[in-house]
């Protein structure tokens, strides 16, 4: 591991030199590629340098244990450094794991009210607000593609793009069924109801990753509608696109322009086709390797939001946090960071 880390540090220094090279600076494409590789290596190199410094201090402290005058002080330093070094080794092993090629991509998120009728649709709206506030804290941008409203202001379905560095790496663990336990605003008897909403997170696919031929796409136009099904546009600006070979459908009615709606719908269609290809490839890989590592099936109930107890429980990793109010305000870091570390640990264990 140390030889590999040393080689990565050498490569990192070489990339820094290239970023100062006038020839690289003039070439926009090359500059972008070098900058991207340098930024990807930076976290690993930074942790490695801290680890190396700690190891040097640890070796020095161990050496001082033979000195009667310094023994007590050295023991204290060794006791402090040992857990720090162990923690850094765990981080380095995780950083050296193969990266998910989709981690730096923008994502398309689809939220749908499931079991629970109007209450499920309202909860879908709460999830959308939670992700919107989390995205704002990450300096990401959100762009709504399509939404189907209920009369009470919830969402039967809402589809949106999250644009920003590392969006997929943090949001990919949100795939699945989210359960809410609370007293609905429409409940006069004060009884707690259980409802669910489903979340799908797809990496945005580029044209070069998924080739969709015009002849394979059927385009239909229709009049866009707003809350309660009311028409909000008398022209047929809403667009529905169908990928005929797979039967995958996407639609958009958020823009007034039919052209813009088609562009957005095609983004969703491309992401869904890309996701289908990836899931088929993963299923084939899992069958061959009997892999148990994954981000959880979408049909799983992955998380429960209990309003009465101000509690959020992630069932995949047994995590319970009594901060529901803050999590719904977008303070999701504790949940997401714990998920990332857990799945990295599982991947590291599977790799060894």
Swiss-Prot record:
Post-translational modification (record): Methylated by PrmC. Methylation increases the termination efficiency of RF1.
Record-linked InterPro entries: PCRF (IPR005139), Pep_chain_release_fac_I (IPR000352), Pep_chain_release_fac_I_sf (IPR045853), Prokaryotic/Mito_RF (IPR050057), RF-1 (IPR004373)
Gene3D superfamilies, alphabetized: 3.30.160.20, 3.30.70.1660, 6.10.140.1950
Main location: cytoplasm
Alphabetized GO MF terms: translation release factor activity, codon specific
Top-rank lineage group of the source organism: Bacteria
GO cellular component terms listed in the entry, alphabetical order: cytoplasm
Localization in the cell: Cytoplasm
Keywords noted in UniProt: Cytoplasm, Methylation, Protein biosynthesis
Location of N5-methylglutamine modifications: 230
KW ATP-binding (keyword) present: no
Protein family per UniProt: Belongs to the prokaryotic/mitochondrial release factor family.
Chain's role: Peptide chain release factor 1 directs the termination of translation in response to the peptide chain termination codons UAG and UAA.
NCBIfam families referenced in this protein's UniProt entry, alphabetically: prfA, PRK00591.1
Name this polypeptide is given: Peptide chain release factor 1
